[in-house]
Amino acid sequence: MLQPKRTKFRKVHKGRNRGIAAGTEVSFGTFGLKAVGRGRLTARQIEAARRAMTRAVKRQGKIWIRVFPDKPITEKPLEVRMGKGKGNVEYWVALIQPGKVLYEMDGVSEEIARNAFALAAAKLPIKTTFVTKTVM
């Protein structure tokens, strides 16, 4: 699963998921899966969606993952009293704003791409839409 090789700090503040997204255009492939809602994707969810897409296209074409989980999320163990410091890092997430392209695909027909992205979208906790590359 995806996670940073090394970080400057082990734990980070919770923060807020506001603002507008960068990476809103399909730039590598021909088709893309774009986030409509706001939320966060765990490394497990990103990988599950990638596997679903890879199986759907029967390993043909190329898939790009445009998001990376770079924020550590901590949890305290069960039945532990409050206080005594911040919990341990349990998983990594990517913060997603509306308009962000999550995945891109090329080398397959639009019908296959739509089907693959529909399977991937079912694995994700945020609302998404299918987009195609705009030619200038």
Curated annotation (Swiss-Prot):
Segments crossing the lipid bilayer: none
PROSITE patterns: RIBOSOMAL_L16_1, RIBOSOMAL_L16_2
Source species: Pasteurella multocida (strain Pm70)
GO biological process, one term: translation
Superkingdom as given in the UniProt entry: Bacteria
Protein name: Large ribosomal subunit protein uL16
Cell membrane keyword on record: no
Keyword terms, alphabetized: Ribonucleoprotein, Ribosomal protein, RNA-binding, rRNA-binding, tRNA-binding
PANTHER family from the UniProt entry: 50S/60S RIBOSOMAL PROTEIN L16, LARGE RIBOSOMAL SUBUNIT PROTEIN UL16M
